[in-house]
Each structure stands twice: as C-alpha cells, then as structure tokens.
Amino acid sequence: LMRSSAASDVYKRQVFTMTEKRDDLYLPSREFVEQAHIQSRAEYERMWKQSIEDPDTFWGYIAKDFHWFKPWTQVYRGEPEIGDNEWFVGGKTNICYNCLDAQIEKGRGDKVALLFQGEPEADCKRFTYNDLLKHVCRFANALKKNGVKKGDRIVLYLPMIWQLPVVMLACARIGAVHTVVFGGFSAEALADRMLACGAKKMVTTNGYWRSGQKINAKANADKACMLCANAGLTIDDVFVVDRMVDFEVPYITYRDTALSKELMLDEISDYCPAEKMDAEDPLFIMYTSGSTGSPKGTLHTTAGYMVYTYTTFKYIFDYKEDDIFFCTADIGWITGHSYIVYGPLLNGATTVMYESVPTYPEPDRFWHIIDKFKVTIFYTAPTVIRALMNQDIQWIEKHDLSTLRLLGSVGEPINPEAWHWYSHYVGHDRCPIVDTWWQTEAGGVLISTIPGAFGSKPGSAALPFFGVKPVVLRSRTSGDEPAVEADVNEKGELCLVSAWPGIMRTLYGEPERHQNGYYTQQPGYFFTGDGAYKDEDGYFWITGRIDDVVNISGHRLGTVEIEDALLSHPAIVEAAVVGYPHKVKGEDLYAFVILDKNSKESEEDIRKELKAVVRSDIGPIAVPGKIQFVREMPKNRSGKVVRRILRKIASNEIDEISDSMINILAEPGVVDEIAQNRIGDK
C-alpha cells in the first residue's frame, strides 16, 4: 500500500479528519441521481432480491437485449453449491456478433468504438463500429485460412496494441478459444500457460513500446515455443503482428506467418460470418497471475459471460450513450477483458485503450489522455492512484478533467486516504467512486457501489451486484464443523452462496483442482479466498487475501489493516507487511516501507513513530517486530507487490527465491538490494 506526500499539508489534515470514522457515507449529487439508471437503495434492493429469488425471470429479461441465433430453453440449470452451472441452456449466440454487428444494426456503425493511444503521442487511432467489424472479419478470415477452427485454443501473447482486442474478437467470431497472456510475462511464464492449455497456435508481435524502449516480444515468443517443444508440445503456427516499423525480427519460415502480408491478400474478405456458438461453448481461458504456484486456467463460456459483463458495465458505471470509458488495466488480465473489450462494446460504448505506463514521458499521461479524449468514466487501480499521488499536483492541474462524471477502482481494497485524494484531485469532489471487488473467476464485478442508488464508504466495496449473494463465514477448524455466519463487523472468510452468469465453469483441464480450490473449504459455498466483514449497513469490507493473515500468539491479524496504519504516517509512501517465523509468538510481523523522498527525520525516529502509530491504531499485538526501509518494492509488471518474495526475505529463506519468481518482476535487481539489507534476528 502507498500514500502521498504530494498533497498540501492542509489537505492531509482534511483527509485524516474525514477518515477517522470508517462509516463515513458519501452520497452522489441530486443531479447524478436524477440521471442514473437506479436512483435509490430501495430500487436496488428490489432488483437484487428478484435476481436471487427468481434468477430465471431477472436474467432472462436482460438476455433479450442480445441477438440469439436460437433462443434458450432454460435460463439456469445446475447446482451452485458444487460449482455445476449452466446458463441460457440450449441457446445459440456469438459474443462478437453482439459486440459489433448488433451495434451496427442499432445504428451505431459510425460511432467510435475504440480509441487507441500508443505510447508515441502521434500514434492515435479511432475505430468506428464499422471499422472494427471490418478489421475483425479480415483477421478472422486470415486465421481461418491458416487452419484455425472452432474449438482451437490459441494463445495471444500481445501487448496493449489495438490488434489485441481485434484478434480476441476474431477468435470469438469463429469459435476459437483465446488465451491472452500478459505481454510483460517471461518466456517461461508464457510456455507454462501454453502447455497448460495445450495451445498449438499463437499470435504475437515483433515488438512494442515501453517507457521509450523498444521491446522485442518475438524473442520471448520464440523461446516459449522452444520450451514447449522440449516439453513435448509442438507449436504449429505463430502469427506475427507488425507493431514496430523498421524493427526486424527473425521469422521461422515453416511456422511463422506475417499477418500484415496475409491481410493484404485479395482472398481475405472484409466479411466473415459469425459462428453459431452454444451458450456454454468456451469463450476464453484466463490464467491467474504467475506470482504464486502453477497457473490456474479459469474457463469462461459464451452466453453467461456476455450477459454478465454487459449488465455490470451498464449499471455499475451507470453507462450512457455519450460516455467515453477509459479503463487503465492491461487486457492480459481479466479487468481488461471485461471492461476494455467485451463489457463496453456489448453496450455500444466508446472504449479507450492505452499502450504504455502512466508515467511516460511524464507523470501526467493518464490526465492528458482524459483531457484529450474527453473521458467521462475513469477506471483504474489503487496501485496506480497511490503511485500518482506521490507526484506533484501540478501534473493534474495542467489538464482539464471536467468531463469526468464517474470514477472507479479495481484490483485491491483502496485505502481511505487514496480514496479521498482520488475524489478530491481527480474527481473534484463531484464524481461518485465505485470501488469494485471481484476476481478472475467471477468474470465481472461482484460487489460494488451502484452510483445513483446509494453512497460510498471510503475503503468499502459496498453491496453485492445482481445475482451475487455473499456471506462472511467463520473459519472452520474441522472437516465436519458446520458453516457459521460471522456477526456484524466480525472478520471472516468471504464466500458466495449463489451462481451468477459470469462465473467460471471450471479450471481448464483440472476439474479436481476446481472442486478442491473453491468448494471444499466451506462446503456448499464458493470460497473466494478473501477475508471480509459486513458492517451494520450491509456494506462489505475486504480485508485482504486469507493467506495475508498472520497468526501471532494465537491472534489472527490481517496485514492490510497494519499497512493502513503505517500509511497514516506522513513520511511513508508505500508499505507491505508479511509474517515471518518467531520462536515464541509463532509468527511476527515484518514491515517493508518506502520513505517519502522529502522526509527529514531519521530512520530510527520514524521507526519508533511507526510502532507507536500501529500500537495506537490497532494494538500492541500488531506492532511489527521488524521495520525495514527500502527503495522499491518487488512488483510484477502489472504493478502488484509480489509478497511471496517479501515473505522469503523476511523468513531468511532467500535461497528459495526462484528464477521464476524473479522473472516476473518489473525490476529484478530490487530483490538483492532488499535481501542484503534484511534485518536479522537479535
């Protein structure tokens, strides 16, 4: 977690005053409510109740908004308590058709569908729905010409370039199952995912821009293919997108195809008919981050995912026809799938896609994009917010952000100070904030504010979305112990009772892992792996992953709370807390913190003050035994702290930090730096 030193001292005092009470409620303006899709909590509760008690009627009504080649015979069939779920049984549709053709049929052919901003400022492209359909069909026909067919699994190892959503939609159009692998992953991580899904075809690029540097993506793709071959999987075809001009990469003649040349062939038609997909046909496989363990391939299917992403986008972002939507996620993660590509396009929206990082060439790149494209809805991660908080406020003030009407947060709980900074400096205290909680397994948002219906509490994910019934359960200590719901404000394990259309159907090729990982910890419930509590207003507060709980002398403590306390000190920019073995307590707390560059106090004085803050805010039991000052955290290329590495350092298991852990880091050298300065045992 991070905090800012960039805001004025006056604003810092305001933040602390405003966040002393965790139940502060911030309501949307009357003007916002009057134009919102859902305008009261009572209306929300009526809709939510119907979605739980009568899901067939609720979701069946929404599904009528789509084009179906054949109508469904049953809305839902299954046993949610064991993860056996089918939606829109017997129906046939195509998500690409509904993203593009159906929008054109509704009169949106000349509306801008995709605004692409490359890292070079001049590299800006606008695609209407007509344009996008033409590009998608040509890509689809090129893939079909080269042997890609319905049911084939195809890996997309592409960065944030406009061809990525085009190829995704092309796969969906012809029934191929796409597996997007984050462009920042190493060859080893890419090969792991290719082997896991058995993909024999890949789309990659010759290179891309990252912070002013040309990155050779093809080299990683070639190495991954070699690793797959060594493991017994031969990659038959690699299709190469020429992103970089005058950037030569080697081609393997028997395997590689330059898509740019294929697309110029006369035989590649501008139209490709959409495959009639069964509602439960696979759409994509999305692998979880490689930061921990072997990758898990969540399998999402066609119709349920389509209906759910459409609905969450419409209501959570209160989408209107003239909105410009900017989600800063990478499409290599589920947020980019659902809220850069599928959710916006299914609603006929204009979606913004940016190639690179928020701080290049200057720390105002996001604010510049918002100003340039007149963005109305901005959706980003707390990690990004906290990083930009640490920049001078002038980078925001030089841009016009007045078109913004709604802000969103995704990826992790947002600490209250970051929430207030985001609201004040980006939203000018007039934009509601939707703090969304969900997972790769979910397909779309599960808990969030509905911005016109009820207010936000800084740090709380708020209330469940339609079709989602969360409960907080006490931990079970034995296999035959029944599930017990936690009391109000009592921390426990966040589980889900019901099924919703977007839920993954299984882990690809690993049905037992699917069952054991999600349905055995609390039998009869979907186990999210997150801790939470529910307050007296029904709002849910996410306390972090269950494995981020440390047991000190029999007391279970969530590290997120301790990080929040450390961040309340004005000299701390970022904090990460992990457990390490202690011969008396069982475990103790090890805090890694980054100092504000403008801090004048000595490290020893700050260390004492930090312990005092934690003692005051949480209690003596939560005071970290060790506090180490670091220059940078070990983060993967999506900006998330890899806590597994910090645990190894804290536990003095440095020799167990494998190359596969280090390969996913944006700055691998930081590991040695932190390890060399590890605080030893006295």
Language-model features, listed with the residues they occupy:
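Single conserved hydrophobic/aromatic residue that forms the stacking wall/gate
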Residues: L1-Q14
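Conserved AMP-binding/adenylate-forming core of the ANL superfamily
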Residues: K49, C96-Y97, L114-L169, S186-A191, ...
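Conserved pre-ATP/AMP-binding loop-to-beta segment of ANL
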Residues: D110-V112, I235-V241, D246, I252-Y287, ...
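Structural core segment of the AMP-binding/adenylate-forming
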Residues: L169, R173-L263, A381-P382
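AMP-binding/adenylate-forming catalytic core of the ANL superfamily
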Residues: V181-G207, A221, D371, F378, ...
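AMP-binding/adenylate-forming catalytic domain of the ANL superfamily
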Residues: V240, V584, S616-V641, D655-D681
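Conserved AMP-binding/adenylate-forming
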Residues: Y315, Y354, D371, R405-L407, ...
